[in-house]
């Protein structure tokens, strides 16, 4: 740990020095001196020097408008470099043990040591592994793609500099390259000027596949195979690839009017084009590698007389021609041209798999396994993991849009207004129509624009090549009719296959009713017959936490999953739980291993399907090596959860959780919904209103343009509180509820829960993480600078609550300080605080200046506005998340 941390500190210090030299070259010694003075004051302030803290505040308040931007940029860029160094150290040879591929070896050894598990059971669990990662655009990566590319290269330089045997000349060249990259970053505008379109977001997702996952996935499988061979004497079958990728970019239209049927159609084509492009590069490599002559009779027959000389090459060249023709056809479609379909148009994975696998089998049979298991095996595994679509797309739409569309249809048909019918009448109508062989609507019907959009989306799904759409997710699902409605709309569009339709239960009430809704659906004969023994249900983390607070939401999520698992098991249905976790803790984020092991027993039997959100994609999959670590962590957690499931919670533990949930929810809603001062306080103490100016994602920040906190999306809600360091949504109500249970004489039970129940210990661990990032003096400074004195009492009350909460959690965990069991993370937060604190102070100052100008009816100073955006990006980097 110490060796790793000192290596990280020395790299961070070296990068900081290079950044300092860059600033001096660009802006002169004076600005660098100013930045260095602020850094030293911040360090001393963190060490508890009150006089230096006051001097830090005064220095930042007195910066001229010309100094604001360089100072903000200096600290923001430093944090990006620190994050890059930290990402590198998590995968370096002396990196954090928990994130190395070794984690699989440790898990396999642990499983082998269990007296009740034999090797066959472990092999079966490996073969049933299923991991589907769903990439989403929001909260949206705040860092520009151009800067991400530079940081990837910085990472590569750090890796090479770590080599102890490097020659002086090479060391000099690498340092020169580092200086160039950091100078390029400094002279690049870190805030993008325009909001990305849904197509831009999709391209960002494809870039992650190309730059990291394309190499990372086969390398992870190679690593997994080696560990299985070493520990179980077992090799993965060639066609076994447990990892798949899906995307919401270009498919998620919930609250985003910019994602239309045409956009989805375009993104589907673009995704296929990118896949073709990447497979073309692979095949080109194989053409140069597979020059062998000896082959099996089967392969010779496939190659024919023309390919007799170099059969493998011949087949690869044939595949290359097919890929090029497919790419040209897709390019024409993307430009709006209609070309006749080429005879060899690639639309199915089998068309890629068959020639590649034929070559693989032949090489193995002819004693050339060493060649077969090289680039060729990697390409075969990419066919299984990415295939023709590259990433599949989920369609997501809000339930009310379907209800409104059906209402318009029934009114047109003169059979009443579907929207006003009872749930029983809706179900009766839907089941009747689903069983009917005739279409519901005449072809000449002209719907409204909103309804046409819903119907056109269903048409896009029906026309898409099979396998390119993964699921239809219904947000804000509340009733069985919400699910049946989508099935009817898809039937009307002429869909020729059974697409998984997943209700998303995301408020406290909906989570509590989820099992009833699914039980009713499974009791409908048509439904049971149609789903063919498989059901996907999505659990919403971010909206439930925003609705009820983290403690009540996490217990509702646990109970909903637990009940659904038991209901589906009883009904003989294979359940896939789809976890809509955010990156931040207030939106359900948690370290993967801990989060998975804290779920109810049996929750991963149907595999893991989970959203990977915005900025977390870069942290977890930004480099091939990091991808291997992240996938290894998921793999070990799924194996452990399925073979060593966590205990069923005791009845008294459930009772305590029910009490914690009830007390925390009342307190959370008491502030957020019922306190008349809360919304004005939130609006003034955080940069919530200013966040709208950041050109982040393609999706509006609010579901409805007007409205208070309840209409605000979970992401800006969390983002705003993260910026002012109160982190309120991630803890409000939780500590006070724990305190009440302690006062009721149940501290020893809470300690036992913390010790013996992964669900509860993970919950407390997440609270500790939030408390470590929260900061009382900074939150108070925002109040003093930005909030009217008549609202100060509310801020004081909230900060007192936070301080008391920290003490109660430490008492239950029997620790003297936060993050005692994760010193690596505690050190990392402390290191970044020195650079984040000045950005927070500066942000409060900039918000003050910006709002003063607005109140005086003046146009805001562009230097102030730009510096404000930079502080927002910088604090997000310091906190390691946006929303």
From Swiss-Prot:
Its cofactor is Mg(2+). It comes from the Bacteria. GO terms for biological process: carbon fixation; oxaloacetate metabolic process; tricarboxylic acid cycle. GO terms for molecular function: magnesium ion binding; phosphoenolpyruvate carboxylase activity. The active site is at residues 138, 546. Signal peptide: none annotated. Its EC number is 4.1.1.31. Disulfide bonds: none annotated. InterPro entries: PEP_COase, PEP_COase_bac/pln-type, PEP_COase_Lys_AS, PEPCASE_His_AS, Pyrv/PenolPyrv_kinase-like_dom. PROSITE patterns: PEPCASE_1, PEPCASE_2. Keywords: Carbon dioxide fixation, Lyase, Magnesium. Gene3D superfamilies: Phosphoenolpyruvate/pyruvate domain. It catalyses: oxaloacetate + phosphate = phosphoenolpyruvate + hydrogencarbonate. GO terms for cellular component: cytosol. SUPFAM superfamilies: Phosphoenolpyruvate/pyruvate domain. It is an enzyme of class 4 (lyase). Forms oxaloacetate, a four-carbon dicarboxylic acid source for the tricarboxylic acid cycle. Belongs to the PEPCase type 1 family. This is Phosphoenolpyruvate carboxylase. The gene is ppc.
